[in-house]
């Protein structure tokens, strides 16, 4: 099973195959419809200026769309179920992450608690679960269901992405190999958008983690990757052509 999302999707997409090499097929109904997600099921009205989420001030508009996105899926072997972190829209226009569970990978039951910012990517290291989120901030918890505590500033990732950095991460991904945590991410404002990589050696004190200098791992080369499109700085929101 491969779970993915449309930026303005009304449900989580699912592709399936008998082999990683394919052929892959789309499960057309999708899973976890926005109407069942516990997030706003329809586009809410614009809130008063003093109630807008702080990040929305950087957008020209159009951020108030009901959606579910950014699935991060983990197999719970002992519980024989699938755990999926996902985010959606609150009535005040902010976006947050929840977790949902499924016994078959098709029907998911969302949990009520809000766990943190959008774009959760979670790994387990020793006794802790660590999550990176939009803007590169790290959180941690003892349990998959939270609660997650936010790392105090300037944490190791925020030293990469703080006010003095030209990098503004958009979509993160984590890969843990032994004690080495690999962080992959794209950046808002890139022209064109690229995939960066950096890594750090983990220890028990997450405030002592130090990431290497990010380097560009992938840039658009093929037409289907967007290499033939006009070079324009990326912005927050959906991509249009």
Question: What would you call each of these model-derived segments?
Answer:
Residues 1-70, 74-170, 175-241:
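Beta-rich carbohydrate-recognition and catalytic domains
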């Amino acid at each position: 099973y491969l779970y993915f999302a449309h930026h303005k999707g009304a449900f989580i997409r699912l592709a399936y195959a008998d082999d990683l090499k394919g052929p892959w097929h789309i499960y057309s109904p999708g899973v976890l419809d926005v109407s069942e997600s516990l997030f706003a099921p329809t586009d809410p009205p614009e809130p008063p200026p003093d109630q807008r989420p702080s990040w929305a001030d950087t957008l020209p508009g159009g951020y108030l769309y009901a959606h579910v996105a950014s699935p991060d899926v983990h197999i719970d072997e002992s519980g024989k179920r699938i755990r999926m972190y996902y985010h959606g829209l609150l009535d005040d226009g902010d976006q947050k992450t929840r977790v949902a569970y499924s016994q078959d990978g098709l029907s998911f039951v969302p949990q009520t608690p809000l766990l943190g910012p959008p774009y959760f990517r979670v790994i387990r290291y020793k006794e802790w679960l660590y999550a990176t989120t939009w803007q590169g901030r790290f959180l941690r918890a003892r349990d998959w269901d939270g609660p997650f505590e936010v790392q105090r500033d300037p944490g190791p990732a925020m030293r990469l992405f703080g006010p003095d950095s030209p990098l503004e991460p958009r979509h993160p991904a984590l890969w843990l190999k032994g004690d080495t945590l690999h962080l992959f991410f794209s950046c808002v404002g890139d022209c064109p958008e690229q995939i960066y990589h950096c890594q750090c050696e983990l220890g028990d004190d997450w405030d002592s983690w130090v990431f290497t200098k990010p380097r560009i791992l992938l840039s658009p080369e093929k037409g289907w990757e967007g290499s033939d499109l006009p070079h324009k700085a990326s912005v927050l929101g959906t991509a249009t052509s």
